[in-house]
């Protein structure tokens, strides 16, 4: 597991209050992890802060699974 993947999963666990083993790469934030729209906004903000990047709203709307978040961060983050 990459450092980015670990960090993304840790943020998901903290933000959504779910168990680590529930946070699989294919897990959907809404369907599998029970997030609502406010949770997803807070999750995006936490990812932006952790990885020092800006995630535009139109991009954030496309990030619906753990893997999509990992892929976005891999493509756009500085650290």
Curated annotation (Swiss-Prot):
Positions modified as O-(pantetheine 4'-phosphoryl)serine?
37
A biological process (GO) of this protein is: lipid A biosynthetic process
Q: Which PROSITE patterns match?
A: CARRIER, PHOSPHOPANTETHEINE
What SUPFAM superfamilies does its record include? ACP-like (SSF47336)
Q: What does the record give as its pathway?
A: Lipid metabolism; fatty acid biosynthesis
List the keywords (alphabetical). Cytoplasm, Fatty acid biosynthesis, Fatty acid metabolism, Lipid biosynthesis, Lipid metabolism, Phosphopantetheine, Phosphoprotein
The residue stretches assigned to a coiled coil in this entry are: none
Q: Key word Ribosomal protein present in the record?
A: no
InterPro entries assigned to the protein according to its UniProt record, in alphabetical order: ACP, ACP-like_sf, PP-bd_ACP, Ppantetheine_attach_site
Q: Name one GO molecular function term.
A: acyl carrier activity
* UniProt modification remark: 4'-phosphopantetheine is transferred from CoA to a specific serine of apo-ACP by AcpS. This modification is essential for activity because fatty acids are bound in thioester linkage to the sulfhydryl of the prosthetic group.
Q: Tell where it localizes.
A: Cytoplasm
**Residue ranges of every copy of the Carrier domain listed in the record:** 2-77
Q: Would you say which domain of life the source belongs to? A: Bacteria
* One Pfam family per UniProt: PP-binding
Q: Name one GO cellular component term.
A: cytosol
The entry's function note states: Carrier of the growing fatty acid chain in fatty acid biosynthesis.
Member of which family?
A: Belongs to the acyl carrier protein (ACP) family.
Q: Write down what this protein is called.
A: Acyl carrier protein
- The encoding gene: acpP
